[in-house]
C-alpha cells in the first residue's frame, strides 16, 4: 500500500482556509480517495485541550515562548495519534495549519526567531513534513474584515492582536515560503470561493492522482 499524502493549508486569520478544506475534502472523497480533515492546534482530545489554553482571550499574559512550546506540544500529540496512523494506512490527510504557522506567528511575528522555533518543532515532529503546503496569501486588513463580518466564528486571542502583528505574520509566511518553495505553493486568497477552490484543485490534482492511484 502506498503511503498517504499530508496536505497542509496555511495562512493568516480570515484567509478562507477552513472553508477551502471543507470543499477540497468533498472533492477528494467524491473521487473515491480515502481522506480525513483535521486542524491545529487540535484534532484530538489532548491537543484540543491545549488549543483552549492557547487561544483563550483570558490568557493575554501568555509568554511568547510558552505559546510556541504549547503549539509544539499539541502538534506532537496530534501527529503521533492521528496524522501518522492515517498516512501509514494510505489516507490523504488535510490539515488546517502545521509547522509553518509556528514559524510565521511565533518565529517571526513574535520575534522568537524562525530558526529557534524551527528547532523546537523539529524536536516535536522529527522528519514528518507536509508533502505539500498551500499558503493562502491575503492582505490582513481584508482577512480581519472577514472575521468581523462572520458571526459564526468565535473570536480568539490571536484575532484581537493589532493589525501590525497580522502584517508581520504575512511577512513571516513570505519568508518561510521563499525558503521552502519546493513544498509550499502560494495562492491569491483575494478571490471568489470558486476561484480559490479551482486554484487548489489544479495544484493538488497531479499530486493526488500520481501518488495515490
UniProtKB/Swiss-Prot annotation:
CDD domains: TMPK. This is Thymidylate kinase. It comes from the Bacteria. The lineage of its organism: Bacteria, Bacillati, Bacillota, Clostridia, Eubacteriales. ATP binds at residues 11-18. Phosphorylation of dTMP to form dTDP in both de novo and salvage pathways of dTTP synthesis. It is an enzyme of class 2 (transferase). Keywords: ATP-binding, Kinase, Nucleotide biosynthesis, Nucleotide-binding, Transferase. Belongs to the thymidylate kinase family. GO terms for biological process: dTDP biosynthetic process; dTTP biosynthetic process; dUDP biosynthetic process. It catalyses: dTMP + ATP = dTDP + ADP. One of its GO terms (cellular component) is cytosol. InterPro entries: P-loop_NTPase, Thymidylate_kin-like_dom, Thymidylate_kin_CS, Thymidylate_kinase. Pfam families: Thymidylate_kin (PF02223). The gene is tmk. Its EC number is 2.7.4.9. GO terms for molecular function: ATP binding; dTMP kinase activity. The keyword Nucleotide-binding applies. PROSITE patterns: THYMIDYLATE_KINASE.
Amino acid at each position: 500500500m502506498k503511503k498517504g499524502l499530508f496536505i497542509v493549508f496555511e495562512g493568516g486569520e480570515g484567509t478562507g482556509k477552513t472553508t477551502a478544506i471543507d470543499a477540497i475534502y468533498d472533492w477528494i472523497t467524491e473521487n473515491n480517495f480515502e481522506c480525513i480533515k483535521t486542524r491545529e492546534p487540535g484534532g484530538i482530545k489532548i491537543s484540543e485541550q491545549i488549543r483552549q489554553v492557547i487561544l483563550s482571550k483570558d490568557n493575554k499574559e501568555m509568554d511568547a515562548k510558552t505559546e510556541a512550546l504549547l503549539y509544539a506540544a499539541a502538534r506532537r500529540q496530534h501527529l503521533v495519534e492521528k496524522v501518522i496512523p492515517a498516512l501509514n494506512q494510505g489516507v490523504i490527510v488535510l490539515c488546517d495549519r502545521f509547522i509553518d504557522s509556528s514559524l510565521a506567528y511565533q518565529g517571526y511575528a513574535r520575534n522568537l526567531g524562525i530558526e529557534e522555533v524551527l528547532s523546537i518543532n523539529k524536536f516535536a515532529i522529527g522528519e514528518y513534513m507536509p508533502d505539500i503546503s498551500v499558503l493562502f496569501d491575503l492582505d490582513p486588513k481584508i482577512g480581519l474584515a472577514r472575521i468581523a463580518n462572520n458571526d459564526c466564528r468565535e473570536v480568539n486571542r490571536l484575532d484581537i492582536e493589532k493589525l501590525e502583528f497580522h502584517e508581520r505574520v504575512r511577512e513571516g509566511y513570505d519568508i518561510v515560503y521563499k525558503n521552502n518553495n519546493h513544498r509550499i505553493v502560494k495562492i491569491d486568497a483575494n478571490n471568489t470561493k470558486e476561484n480559490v477552490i479551482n486554484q487548489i484543485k489544479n495544484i493538488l490534482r497531479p499530486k493526488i492522482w500520481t501518488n495515490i492511484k
